[in-house]
Amino acid sequence: MIIGNKLESINEINELNLNKFPEQLFNISEENEVEKFLDSYPADFYAIRDKSKAGGTFKLKVARDDVLNEIKGYSLFTINVSSANYVDNQLLVGEIEFLSNDEVYATLSIDPTASVRDALSNPSFNFKTNIFDKRLNDIPYFDYIYKYISDNNLYDVVVEFALFDKGVGIKDEKIIVYELRTHY
C-alpha cells in the first residue's frame, strides 16, 4: 500500500472501510453542500482541515454556527464531526506504526482533550522500539490497538487514530482512523 498524500489517505480509509467520523471533502464554492452536510450530521462541534497541503490549517472545535465563516479562504478542505464532541470518552490518541520487521513507532497521548497534533508535540508515550519491548505494556489498551491494526492489515502504515470508551463514528466502533500515511 502506497499513500502519497491526504487525498489518497481519505480514499484508502474509505476503501478499507475503516471507522471514521462523518467527513466530506469540499471545494471553495460548495457552501450549499457544506450546509447539507451539517444538516445530515448534526453535532455541537466540527473539525475543519485544509487538504490542499500537508500540515495545513486544522481547526478541531468549530461550533456549527461558525462553520461557514471559518471555511472562507480554504480552497480544498474537509469537514467532519469533531472528536471534541467526545472529549469525555477519549482514552488514547496519536499515531502508531507496526512494521513487518517487528519495529513499532508509537507517539500517543492519554490526555482526553488532545488532538493527534497535540499528542505528537506533547506525548504521554513516544517509543521507537520493537514488538517485544515490555514498555509497550505501559500503553493503555495496547493489545486492543494491535488487534485492530492486525485485523485490518495496516502493517507498514502510519495510522493516526483515537480510541474511545464507547462506539463512535460511522461504524459505531471504539477506534476512529483519522489518517493513513506511507510516503508523505
Give the predicted meaning of each segment.
Residues M1-Y184:
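Nucleotide/phosphate-binding sheet-loop regions of phosphoryl- and nucleotidyl-transfer enzymes
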